[in-house]
Amino acid sequence: MQWKLRKRKGVTAMEEITASEVRARLAAGERAGRSFTLLDVREPDEVAADAIEGSQRIPLGEVVSRMGELDPARVTIVHCAAGIRSKRAIKALRRAGFTGELVNLTGGMKAWHKSAPAAPPASSPPPRDRS
């Protein structure tokens, strides 16, 4: 499956991917940590409350000092709550010399939850036998 990336226009172009596209890759059998890395840059209390399975967790404030934990041979999809800290993390990693491909998850966890498949309707109990 090819990456569907968008480059945003601006001072610094940044590759982005939607939550739906990440979900599609996971549904197609790709696993976070094998063909790509999901990097969660939120704070530990945020991650404890809610996380994407398989994400590597490095808070924004530690991302540069811990960039050696990231595999530059794999695409790294960076996410946070809404997409702001992940953009900061990408910029910081680039400035620090990280050579791998960095992609921002557009909208972060908010978009992740909005992209979740709708829950199936609750089934009705079987009709009572009134005989």
Task: Go through the PLM ranges and name each one.
Residues 1-37, 41-77, 84-131:
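Rhodanese-like catalytic fold shared by cysteine-dependent sulfurtransferases
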